[in-house]
């Protein structure tokens, strides 16, 4: 089977950077792709901004095969056939209800991007998919933990897919950032790969032979499996109303039945902030001085603030102190879209030349996500470069999954 890919919610191309082992670009700004995954289509659209910086970056690096329109308005007929669908999508409300119009059946809320993913999977009969989301997806919503993921899994099962997932902290496997994300791999029950799955069995897949166990080895310990039968529910509306179960950080769904267990990674030495720190001189614009430095000292310090609830009662909001700056001997913390702004979560490091405290540079932010240097230096403001990296994934995770995905698809 050909290795053809579409990338949804593409951002600045993280899945493509990882799958095609991209480390830089040529004099024209075009990415130098070192593997042969053929990206036949991509979509990137930011509804909140007039200037489409992420799309512009994607086109600069890869060319014009990227769509820049609301994915919900894209007709599936206009999307090329493909073997692998990939994309990182936000954690939203996945609850469903019966529509007032019986012809429409069960409907999810408008604007929830997962339903666009499932529409495309259904219409294009995509053999394989790889998705990324925040780790809290497994426990959402807070008042009915696990419900949203249960709805997603049952929906995918009804579409003819089996699914494997794992929460991966990139730093546990040698990356430069402590970033926990859930990765979800799915395959059609009609694929040759599914025939092999039947012989192996779900527990062995989670422990040793699955996509994630092969790429990201785990300790072979005797943790208990939890079994969840999603077919006991009439449909996803029933799951929305009555779901009660907990998902662990690893699991697999086969024919609507789930096996899930907590797994422990076999830890690898991570890349440290000290290793990704820029060596070049004259980074004065990033050095903290005066009021800005005082503001960070306050934000990172411990505090106890008297606040008032809506009902008028008072309480103290407490916040523990952080170290003055981020250790150069550790990987970075989870980078947010607010990186580089005056914010408690922003990284602060000592400058190599002067020893003074400073912000990360956009290049260092790119290195935390395993992107090539200056990947986002395509004309967007620096503030947006940080934003793009805060929204991106650690491409090293995808790069590491690539050999396993390649073997599966080439053997189809």
Segments from the language model and where they lie:
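Short, solvent-exposed loop/turn segments at secondary-structure junctions
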Residues: 13, 47, 90-94, 135-136, ...
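Class I S-adenosyl-L-methionine
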Residues: 74-82, 94-324
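Core alpha/beta nucleotide-donor-binding catalytic domains of modification enzymes
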Residues: 1-125, 134-149, 157
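Extracellular structured ligand-interaction cores
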Residues: 5, 179-181, 330-332
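C-terminal target-recognition/interaction regions appended to catalytic cores
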Residues: 253-412
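Short glycine- and Lys/Arg-enriched binding-loop motifs that mark or flank ligand-binding interfaces
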Residues: 7-10, 83-84, 170, 336, ...
């Amino acid at each position: 089977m050909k290795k053809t890919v579409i990338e949804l919610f593409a951002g600045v191309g993280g899945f493509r950077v990882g799958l095609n082992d991209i480390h830089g670009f040529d004099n024209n700004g075009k990415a130098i792709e070192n593997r042969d995954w053929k990206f036949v289509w991509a979509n990137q659209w930011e509804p909140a901004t007039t200037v489409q910086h992420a799309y512009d970056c994607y086109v600069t690096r890869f060319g014009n095969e990227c769509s820049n329109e609301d994915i919900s308005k894209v007709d599936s007929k206009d999307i090329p056939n493909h073997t692998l669908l990939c994309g990182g999508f936000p954690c939203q409300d996945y609850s469903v209800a019966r529509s007032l119009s019986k012809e429409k059946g069960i409907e999810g809320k408008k604007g929830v991007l997962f339903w666009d993913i499932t529409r495309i999977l259904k219409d294009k009969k995509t053999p394989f998919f790889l998705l990324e989301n925040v780790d809290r997806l497994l426990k959402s919503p807070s008042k009915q933990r696990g419900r949203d993921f249960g709805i997603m899994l049952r929906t995918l099962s009804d579409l003819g897919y089996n699914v494997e997932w794992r929460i991966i902290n990139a730093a546990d496997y040698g990356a430069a950032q402590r970033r926990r994300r859930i990765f979800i791999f799915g395959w059609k029950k009609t694929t040759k790969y599914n025939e092999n799955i039947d012989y192996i069995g779900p527990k062995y897949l989670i422990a040793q032979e699955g996509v994630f166990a092969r790429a990201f080895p785990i300790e072979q310990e005797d943790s208990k499996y939890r079994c969840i039968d999603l077919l006991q529910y009439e449909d996803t509306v029933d799951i929305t109303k009555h779901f009660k179960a907990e998902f662990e950080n690893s699991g697999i769904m086969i024919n609507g039945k789930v096996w899930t267990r907590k797994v422990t990674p076999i830890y690898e030495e991570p890349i440290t902030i000290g290793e990704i720190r820029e060596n070049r001189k004259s980074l004065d614009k990033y050095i903290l001085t005066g009021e800005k430095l005082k503001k960070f000292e306050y934000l990172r310090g411990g505090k106890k603030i008297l606040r008032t609830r809506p009902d008028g009662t008072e309480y103290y909001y407490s916040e523990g102190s952080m170290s003055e700056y981020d250790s150069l001997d550790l990987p970075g913390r989870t980078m947010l879209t607010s990186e580089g702004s005056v914010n408690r979560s922003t990284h602060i490091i000592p400058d190599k030349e002067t020893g003074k405290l400073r912000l990360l540079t956009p290049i260092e932010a790119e290195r935390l996500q395993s992107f090539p240097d200056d990947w986002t230096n395509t004309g967007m403001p620096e503030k947006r470069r940080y934003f793009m990296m805060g929204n991106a994934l650690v491409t090293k995770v995808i790069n590491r999954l690539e050999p396993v995905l390649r073997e599966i698809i080439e053997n189809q």
